[in-house]
Amino acid sequence: GAAGFSTGRSDNHVSVTGEATPASESEARELAGIAKAFEGLSHGVLQAVSDFDMPKGPDRFEAEFDVLERMAEGASGHPLSISLMQRDMEPDQWRRILARVERATARGVPMRVQVAPRALGVLLGLEATFHPFMGFPSYKAIAHLSLAERVAAMSDPAFKARLLTETSEKVA
């Protein structure tokens, strides 16, 4: 049968109440321990989705990558796949990820990167933590309203026209 473990370590991975998901706060030792469970198996997939603490500043990148590298080291030869993405807040971070993965694999740590051509598993909606309108000034002005009130406001042709003239702030 199939076996795998995936961890989400992103500030976008939060519960509906805004709390971080449990794995996003896991330490290297815990993730390496989970990865060690694959020891002796002929199969198994390990994956990590991380923003490398980008919203907290670029200086956090190395420490976050170290956590994932420790996980890969504990995986007994099973490669750790890391999602590679480019975000507006640090557009060249993908280069840092590739450089670290190359150094790790040169030392025998099995790491890979994968690129999603589109957002997979992203739930969008006005009640979700992330949606296409959240960075626009017009939407931000009504964000505090109930869902029904927001839907009514957004149905107004004048609101639509105004929103279409705006530029969203960077939200991811």
Give the residues covered by each predicted segment:
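Hydrophobic, small-residue-rich alpha-helical packing segments that form membrane-like cores
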Residues: 2-66, 70-71
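Polyanionic/metal-chelating signatures
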Residues: 20, 38, 65, 69-78, ...
